[in-house]
């Protein structure tokens, strides 16, 4: 059975890395699985858009295109833009691969193999799976992530081995009620998303990935990020509605422009 499958690539100030990402996709055996490759630029201040378009043309990657958010929606907002697009264009599945070249497109092969994805709502890449490979990843961040994964697993009664890697796949039917519009636009979007997945009793599994840090520039401010994580955790424990329902955010529009 064939499926209409979107590959979404969020990009922000990654002119060096996005070229490598596009090259890897163009040479991947998984390329034919994607009906469209949508690179969503979040108002980059460098030449991300220009170099991405140039690489797409040079490689004749016909199903790929670069668009740009109407405003800087942050990483979470870019996800909302892509999810809305996948729902409205009646895609069956949407995969996510960050444009900073930390993840590897070929890791999705574990999900495409024997069409495993047909049996689940969410397929989540895990940096901390026993079969995953971390390259140049700081030890203190490994331990910090393992700690928050453990806490999240305890409060959700689900085994959660990663609360937000940059490579995932979702069944679009699962996204149709647009629950994700309630979540923050910032880098904690994935925390809320994973907590919702666990709470909603969605079918999901984690798959191992290779994750590398080379010349990427992190946008994470550790202390403010940790504070927001604690707030999300408290809301999940004591007031799930405060975490999963945000009428103001649901009113916000998320649009992109073709370039």
Segments predicted by a language model, with ranges:
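Hydrophobic helical membrane-anchoring modules
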Residues: 1-2, 157, 181-259
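Acidic helix N-cap motif at the loop->helix transition within catalytic regions
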Residues: 16-19, 46-55
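Short, well-formed alpha-helical segments that are part of the catalytic scaffolds
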Residues: 14-29
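Acceptor/aglycone-binding surface of glycosyltransferases and processive sugar-polymer synthases
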Residues: 69-88, 93, 105-187, 214-224
């Amino acid at each position: 059975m064939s499926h209409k499958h979107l590959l979404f690539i969020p990009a922000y100030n990654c002119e060096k890395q996005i070229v490598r990402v596009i090259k890897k996709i163009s040479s991947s055996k998984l390329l034919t699985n994607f009906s469209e490759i949508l690179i969503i630029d979040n108002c980059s201040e460098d030449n991300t858009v220009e170099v991405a378009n140039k690489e797409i043309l040079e490689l004749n990657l016909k199903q790929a295109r670069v668009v740009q958010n109407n405003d800087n929606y942050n990483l979470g907002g870019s996800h909302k833009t892509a999810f809305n697009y996948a729902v409205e264009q009646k895609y069956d599945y949407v995969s996510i691969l960050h444009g900073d070249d930390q993840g590897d497109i070929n890791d999705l092969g574990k999900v495409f193999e024997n069409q495993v994805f047909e049996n689940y709502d969410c397929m989540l890449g895990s940096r901390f799976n026993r079969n995953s490979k971390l390259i140049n990843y700081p030890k203190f961040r490994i331990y910090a992530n393992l700690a928050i994964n453990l806490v999240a697993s305890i409060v959700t009664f689900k085994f959660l081995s990663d609360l937000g890697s940059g490579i995932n796949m979702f069944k679009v039917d699962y996204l149709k009620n647009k629950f994700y519009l309630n979540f923050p636009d910032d880098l904690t979007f994935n925390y809320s998303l994973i907590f919702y997945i666990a709470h909603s009793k969605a079918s999901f599994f984690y798959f191992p990935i290779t994750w590398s840090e080379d010349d990427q520039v992190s946008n994470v401010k550790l202390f403010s990020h940790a504070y927001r994580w604690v707030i999300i955790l408290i809301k999940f424990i004591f007031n799930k509605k405060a975490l999963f329902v945000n009428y103001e955010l649901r009113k916000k529009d998320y649009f992109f422009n073709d370039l």
